[in-house]
Amino acid sequence: MASFGWKRKVGERVSKQTVQQFEQDSEQADEDEVEREGVDWLHVIKRKREVLLEDCAAKSKRLKEEGALLAEQDRNWEALKKWDEAVQLTPEDAVLYEMKSQVLITLGEVFLAVQSAEMATRLRPIWWEAWQTLGRAQLSLGEVELAVRSFQVALHLHPSERPLWEEDLNWALKLRENQQSLREKASQVDEARRLLVEAPELKGDYDFESDEVIEACSAMADRQKQYEDLKKKAVVVDAHGEAKEMLVEGDDNPTSSSQSVLIKARGL
């Protein structure tokens, strides 16, 4: 009869030293595998990010070019839509903001045009064309002093650009002079009105049979005539940007032998 005994455990005959060596080798292999996997994952993530950025840049470039073609066809709103999509992909592209500003000026959205041009100058502060576009947007908004400064910055960055001298800056300086003329005109009218209402000749006590009354009445008549003459004249800007005084028929209708020389605004 065969004797009964406990079954030996697996590995019972393996020495403890062999087991410990095996466990150490196994742990080292696991650590090496984890390390290799970690490096691989970082590389994969970095590569995916690079590919994503490349895809965004390529798509943004395509949208930019499509928008430029639409703008050349006067399909300005469609062009803006393309560029807005491109901005979402490449928000630090100053050219997109500058192009948007040009189209917004054309559409009369001058406040948005100024904002877009300002963003372009912040992203690329040494790009003279961005400053030129900002100056034109500011002119359209009526900010003549700011426009003069923007054109001066553009000229400082690119002094050889003749259109900046001959068109943009000269026009802005003329507008500034015209604004000064308008302010002086308004000041003269206000002063004439004040002297008419607060005439010092009316504050004295006169003998109605004396010559002082006649002199006071004559002075009042002169003030009245001066005030009316000032009201009959308006300062307008001709096609060459020159400010001129012209007679007006009513309160708001200037008259001239050549109405065609008058302009309301310069197309920038």
Curated annotation (Swiss-Prot):
Q: Which SMART domains match?
A: TPR
Each TPR repeat, start to end: 60-93, 94-127, 128-161
Its domain of life?
Eukaryota
**What Gene3D superfamilies would the database entry show?**
Tetratricopeptide repeat domain
Q: Which PROSITE patterns match?
A: TPR, TPR_REGION
UniProt keywords, alphabetically: Repeat, TPR repeat
Q: Where is this region: Disordered?
A: 14-34, 249-268
Q: Where is the composition biased (Acidic residues)?
A: 24-34
InterPro entries registered for this protein in UniProt:
TPR-containing (IPR052658), TPR-like_helical_dom_sf (IPR011990), TPR_rpt (IPR019734)
Against PANTHER family, the record matches this protein to: OSMOSIS RESPONSIVE FACTOR, TETRATRICOPEPTIDE REPEAT PROTEIN 33
Which named protein is this? Tetratricopeptide repeat protein 33
Highest lineage ranks of the organism? Eukaryota, Metazoa, Chordata, Craniata, Vertebrata
Q: Identify the gene encoding this protein.
A: ttc33
